[in-house]
Amino acid sequence: MIVEQQYIDLFSQTEAMICKHSAEVLNAPRAAAFADFERLGFPTRKREKYKYTDVSKYFEPDYGLNLNRLAIPVNPYEVFKCDVPNMSTALYFVVNDAFYNRALPKVNLPEGVIFGSLKEVAGQHPELVKKYYGQLADTSKDGVTAFNTAFAQDGVVFYVPKNVVVEKPIQLVNILRADVNFMVNRRVLIILEDGAQARLLICDHAMDNVNFLATQVIEVFAGENTVFDMYELEETHTSTVRISNLYVKQEANSNVLLNGMTLHNGTTRNTTEVLLAGEGAEINLCGMAIADKNQHVDNHTSIDHAVPNCTSNELFKYVLDDQSVGAFAGLVLVRPDAQHTNSQQTNRNLCATRDARMYTQPQLEIYADDVKCSHGATVGQLDEGALFYMRSRGIAEKEARLLLMFAFVNEVIDTIRLEALKDRLHLLVEKRFRGELNRCQGCAICK
């Protein structure tokens, strides 16, 4: 465990500092999480779950960490240029891994709704955060989750009380800002009580072209009869590594839509684990990745049908160019008591060059006999027949290829239930295919 040793030493030397600049609720599980990290280490390809991405190697370089919580000299409102200008949102920022609340414009949210710093909310409402924090993100099973829990000092809490509807979408912008190679450990806690409804857009941007390593753990609790949409849009630099673990628990008759879109990145590893714990729960899990050069995108999903009468729909699409690498592994588990399960899983992929590589592993484990489940995966190239037809109608070959690729990913974009975001994504994807979106576009400093 050579890679891990530098972080073991670092934690031993700085644990008091880490705790000093955090909150008691976050500090309580820190020692146990660190012990789990010491035991597990960082995942390597030897673990089946990580066989397409060697996470361990990305922790080898030296990175700076802001454990003393020094102020970052940046005003997000001056440098951030929203890529969704026509969508009215309640806008918030996280700079590196700290919630930005300096000179924050007042946002009018419904009574009882909380959106703010995890550290501050944990101090103001310790019982609320304690009830949920770390309950889904099991540090005993994943080394990255254990590492994040040991080092995370702040993050975001989004709490919606019972039967409250948040009409205006919430937009959370994660900005990476540093002058040296830098590591951040982000944390997001989302709680929707019974009958609540909300929509959240999370955007990842990098202001500087240094090497960034971002670990992220998101926990989502969706109570009975809730409706929750969460969209993640990644537009960072090729020198950015993102390792994200998302945990979701749904109660009876909840409806959750998760859509993660990687438009530009360096290396991305996303893990999504969904537990359908109440009858009538429905999860729609979607993803899209567009990669070129040496970019790497790996999505690993798990949907656990633990009770009867639940529905899961899963759709992931990749377009890979140059020497880029994509991976998708999706498990749907139907437990013995989960009768009347309805589950569909689809993974479709386009490799635009011979050097692009796509690995796909759909998997069903069914232990109930009265279910309706299907899965399918394909890896191929553009339809030559369609290309020939379009060229015969006077469309240039390059333009025809762009149109076919755009049509291919359009199915994922159309799952978005925010019209302004959907319209903007159509434009951003077209620009990405035309090579006009080849770096972070979210910050005015990136010109």
Where are these regions (language model features)?
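Conserved beta-strand/loop scaffold segments within soluble protein domains that form the structured core
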Residues: 111-114, 124, 128-388, 392-395, ...
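Short, low-to-moderate order helix/coil transition modules at the start of elongated helical scaffolds
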Residues: 1-217, 225-227
